[in-house]
């Protein structure tokens, strides 16, 4: 009797082992073949620099309005500045900002993107619709510049335009704009930051000279 029991246990154990082996083999056969994980170091396909994305259009729209106010201030200084250095600087800035703005509007028009001009916003002090991008002058500042005379024009223009350039650079250096795609616009943005940084230093030197 004892031999029968022992024999039965052995048979059951062998059978269980066989069933287990069969189960594991079938699980391995039916499981989907694991695919190799792409290497983390493999870089993604670079974006096409001849195409544009949302960040490109958003930046262009901001700069159109921002630049148009800069042109407005520079044009006032062109006519009314008392110092020749300040007047010549205003002439150059007006030309540069006008050229850059035309380039941004041309791109947006080509891409069938709508945009606002500064003149589209109501000129009401404190109005919620008036642009308040970094560095932009208030309407009261603009009116003060328009009514200023003599050396007051130079002083106020330099103060407002330094802030205006610094604000433009702040916009251009925003973290999210690292995702810009359109190569020509990125180049223009970077060139403008460099140029306006130099102009800020020039304006500060003019201030130090008493302008």
Where are these regions (language model features)?
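Hydrophobic alpha-helical membrane-insertion segments, chiefly the h-region
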Residues: 7-23
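Positively charged n-region of N-terminal signal peptides that target proteins for export
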Residues: 1-4
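All-alpha RGS (Regulator of G-protein Signaling) helical domain and cognate RGS-like helical scaffolds
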Residues: 21-211
């Amino acid at each position: 009797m004892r031999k029968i029991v022992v024999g039965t246990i052995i048979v059951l154990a062998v059978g269980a082992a066989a069933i287990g082996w069969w189960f594991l083999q079938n699980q391995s056969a039916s499981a989907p073949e694991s695919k190799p994980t792409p290497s983390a170091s493999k870089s993604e396909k670079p974006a096409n620099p001849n195409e544009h994305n949302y960040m490109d259009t958003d930046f262009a729209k901001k700069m159109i309005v921002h630049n148009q106010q800069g042109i407005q201030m520079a044009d006032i200084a062109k006519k009314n500045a008392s110092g020749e250095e300040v007047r010549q600087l205003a002439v150059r800035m007006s030309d540069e900002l006008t050229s850059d703005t035309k380039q941004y509007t041309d791109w947006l028009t080509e891409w069938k993107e709508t945009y606002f001009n500064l003149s589209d916003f109501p000129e009401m002090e404190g109005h919620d619709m008036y642009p308040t991008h970094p560095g932009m002058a208030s309407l009261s500042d603009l009116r003060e510049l328009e009514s200023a005379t003599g050396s007051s024009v130079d002083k106020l223009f330099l103060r407002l335009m330094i802030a205006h350039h610094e604000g433009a650079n702040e916009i251009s250096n925003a973290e999210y704009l690292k995702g810009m795609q359109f190569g020509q616009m990125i180049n223009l943005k970077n060139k403008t930051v460099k140029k306006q940084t130099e102009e800020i230093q020039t304006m500060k030197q003019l201030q130090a000279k008493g302008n």
